[in-house]
Amino acid sequence: EPYLQVDFHTEMKEDSDIAFHSRVYFGHWVVMNSRVNGAWQYEVTCHNMPFQDGKPFNLSISVPPDKY
């Protein structure tokens, strides 16, 4: 099943903590979470799907330097 995943790792290592994790399951839902000390935290699932299969979209991520 096609999906789009965005992870903001806290270090340049694959197994580092993830400050923000988002995975879009096109046509279904969006999942958001974070990983702290190797443990996934409370998962938030959004069923209001803003994306549609086959339709283009723009993804813009803005992270202020004093917030991450």
Curated annotation (Swiss-Prot):
The subcellular location is: Cytoplasm, Cytosol; Cytoplasmic granule
Where would one find coiled-coil regions in this protein? none
Q: Among the entry's GO cellular component annotations, what is one?
A: cytosol
Listed Pfam families? Gal-bind_lectin
Kindly list the biological process annotations in GO that this record carries: regulation of activated T cell proliferation; regulation of T cell anergy; regulation of T cell cytokine production; T cell apoptotic process
The Swiss-Prot or TrEMBL record annotates one GO molecular function as: carbohydrate binding
Identification of the protein by name: Galectin-10
Native species of this protein? Mus musculus
Gene name per UniProt: Clc
